[in-house]
Amino acid sequence: LFWVIELGPMISSAISHNGIVYNSTITGRIFAIDVYKKKINWQKEIGSPLVSSLLLYDNLLISCTFNSWINDINSKPHDRNFIYALDINNEGKKKWDVQISGDIFSSPCVCNRKIIVIGSLDSTIYALDMRGNIIWTFNTGGSIWSSPATNNYEIFIGSDDCCIYSFDLNGNLKWKSMLEGKIRATPSLMKSTNSLFIGTHNGIMYCLNQSDGSIKWKYETGKPILSSVAISKDHIFFGCSDKKIYSLKSTNGSIKWKYETGDKVWSSPVVTQKNDDDKEEGMLYVGSLDSHIYGLGIESGRLNWKFPTMDGIESSPCIVKNKMFISSKDGLLYCFSNQQKMDNEKSILNLPIRKCF
């Protein structure tokens, strides 16, 4: 463990760029932390719950609000939610904001360096230019919890209407494919095989053709899949509400291994490849609601490393330049370094924790 800092309850995933890690809290704060100096560069009070992950593009940090979190996650959509653009070079000063009608759980993405795309619980997909102008919208038949994915020419996103949609950058619908179950995970794209991987609330992992949405194969787990797929060569990896982490062959969906944790796995895994001179296999890292971070061998599925937190983990790891960042509902942001030995089951109660609010 390189450091740990207390920020406040988080389910969003951290992002890192140029030695600065950014994350947001359910209590409505955004933090910019210097990775190596282990200190807060700046923090911004938004004043509304933030549950989707931030997007950093050029000098803009995009954040979105989820005001219904204040009362009840199942309450009706709040009528005042915002998409904010903050200037990272000016201590998070607001550049622009856009008001929309629905809560935002979906995390934004940038397409072809031109537009920001995001989904909302008001069933609408929004596309904005870099100045915050809405350039097109599209209404689906259900709330959108899924985050968009892009290959820079097309946009893919799932909806609670059990459909996954494909658009061009002008918002024209290319295709939609109805699957079995609500879609709340984020699509993952595999360029080499023109494949799209997505899991559903009915517990089915699908492989679709990116060009037309046709089903190549499907694999049934039996429990909701909220985790998004990580891809490594010819295998995919994802977590499931049945407490397991799965590895499937990307070409036909046959199972290679599965590993059971102590609770649901909503976190999306990340994988690291071994070096050519490394005798060890590559690693998969993922969090679980059982309050542990897991490190598994991607070839064997063997547990190589496990670290306890003080509450469940819904966020996904972020790995940049030998540093791994992951946040927890315990209010702590963890930074691990693979240049230091990762101690198994080391209690965080014995670690110095900086409180930053």
Where are these regions (language model features)?
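Extracytoplasmic/lumenal domain signature
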Residues: 1-11, 15-357
